[in-house]
């Protein structure tokens, strides 16, 4: 591996002590008898602002939190609600009343015509406390059924890297591919691109970020990759 692609930090294994300046962030970093310890495999890296070191988990499952905007996949249809895959161990619920924004009338409203299995939605997590299914809403600007574009799935742990500091990586992706990109907290990304070639380039670039998220020089490699692909495809 070249120095350009070396990990920008040190691998930490579960149970390993961490420096005192690392913030405890359960369940990934715990304070056990006065010593900070990792509970998952992660990376110990220098903070960009020179403020010491931080622990970054390398693998993560998505645990919903109220206020998160997620991209969900309709998994099944109930009597008065839909069950939604949100890329998490927890299956979410969206009520038909919420989707319609009014009371449901079974004599008039056909749930299958509103949302069917396999449809994607952009929704907000309203409530979740691990004792019941996450509750979703599509009432809000930009929320609802996704009717066009492509969905890409990455590790939820890599979401901050796709967005970048001050949205730098996301802006780079949008400027270089001419795609409109929305990154949901649960590791799903919605792309709306001018054509199939630019969409394919954007998907490949995002996959590179997902695979090489914590390597140095990534932004420059992404720019070079996109520019080269556009040259080859003449787009």
Swiss-Prot record:
InterPro entries: Exosome_RNA_bind1/RRP40/RRP4, KH_dom, KH_dom_type_1, KH_dom_type_1_sf, NA-bd_OB-fold, Rrp4, RRP4_S1, S1_domain. Its main location: cytoplasm. SMART domains: KH (SM00322), S1 (SM00316). PROSITE patterns: S1. Keywords: Cytoplasm, Exosome, RNA-binding. Residues 149-205 form the KH domain. GO terms for molecular function: poly(A) binding. Disulfide bonds: none annotated. It comes from the Archaea. CDD domains: KH-I_Rrp4_prokar (cd22524), S1_Rrp4 (cd05789). One of its GO terms (cellular component) is cytoplasm. The keyword Transmembrane does not apply. Residues 67-139 form the S1 motif domain. It is found in: Cytoplasm. SUPFAM superfamilies: Eukaryotic type KH-domain (KH-domain type I) (SSF54791), Nucleic acid-binding proteins (SSF50249). GO terms for biological process: CUT catabolic process; exonucleolytic trimming to generate mature 3'-end of 5.8S rRNA from tricistronic rRNA transcript (SSU-rRNA, 5.8S rRNA, LSU-rRNA); poly(A)-dependent snoRNA 3'-end processing; RNA catabolic process; U4 snRNA 3'-end processing. NCBIfam families: PRK04163.1-1 (NF003181). HAMAP family: Exosome_Rrp4. Component of the archaeal exosome complex. Forms a trimer of Rrp4 and/or Csl4 subunits. The trimer associates with a hexameric ring-like arrangement composed of 3 Rrp41-Rrp42 heterodimers. Belongs to the RRP4 family. Non-catalytic component of the exosome, which is a complex involved in RNA degradation. Increases the RNA binding and the efficiency of RNA degradation. Confers strong poly(A) specificity to the exosome. This is Exosome complex component Rrp4. The gene is rrp4.
């Amino acid at each position: 591996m070249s120095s350009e692609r070396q990990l920008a930090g040190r691998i930490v294994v579960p149970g390993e002590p961490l420096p005192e300046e690392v913030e405890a962030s359960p369940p990934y970093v715990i304070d056990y008898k006065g010593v900070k310890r990792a509970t998952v495999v992660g990376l110990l890296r220098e903070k960009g602002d020179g403020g010491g070191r931080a622990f970054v988990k390398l693998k993560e499952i998505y645990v919903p939190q109220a206020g998160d905007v997620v991209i969900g996949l309709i998994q099944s249809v109930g009597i008065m609600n839909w069950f939604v895959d949100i890329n998490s161990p927890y299956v979410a619920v969206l009520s038909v009343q919420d989707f319609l924004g009014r009371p449901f009338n079974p004599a008039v409203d056909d749930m299958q015509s509103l949302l069917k299995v396999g449809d994607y939605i952009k929704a907000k997590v309203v409530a979740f406390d691990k004792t019941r299914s996450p509750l979703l809403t599509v009432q809000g600007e930009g929320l609802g059924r996704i009717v066009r574009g492509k969905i890409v799935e990455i590790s939820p742990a890599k979401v901050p890297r796709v967005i970048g500091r001050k949205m730098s990586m996301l802006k780079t992706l949008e400027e270089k591919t001419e795609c409109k990109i929305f990154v949901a907290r649960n590791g799903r990304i919605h792309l709306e691109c001018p054509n199939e070639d630019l969409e394919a380039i954007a998907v490949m670039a995002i996959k590179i970020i997902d695979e090489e998220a914590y390597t140095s020089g990534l932004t420059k490699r992404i720019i070079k990759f996109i520019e080269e692909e556009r040259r080859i495809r003449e787009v």
